[in-house]
Each structure stands twice: as structure tokens, then as C-alpha cells.
Amino acid sequence: MIDKYLDRVVQQLDEKVGRLQEAVGGGAAKDFSEYQKMCGEVQGLLTARLYITDLRKALENSDE
């Protein structure tokens, strides 16, 4: 049951990362500081995604 919620969160993270990557690649950052902020946001979202993936694996292993 929790899998569908975790899947939805991962999907939302992936969508946000994709939008940020497109923005960075498209030159949306006005200056280097904004570029760094956007890259940091991508890094943070990917870290959160990794934590969720690890949590899912731990939950699957606890069921066994």
C-alpha cells in the first residue's frame, strides 16, 4: 500500500528535477549564484529520491 505513495513522491521528484535540468540547460539562471542554487536544488532532490528508494528496499526486506 505504501508503495503507491512512495512511487508518487519519486515521480514528483523526477518531474521537478527534469524541469530544473531543462531550465539550467536552457540558460534560465541569471547569474552564477542562481545557477549554483538550481544545481543545489537538483542535488537535494536526487538525495531525497535516493533516501526514498532506500526506504522502499528496507520495507520490502522487512516483509520477507
Task: Name the predicted role of every residue range.
Residues 1, 57-64:
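Short intrinsically disordered terminal tails
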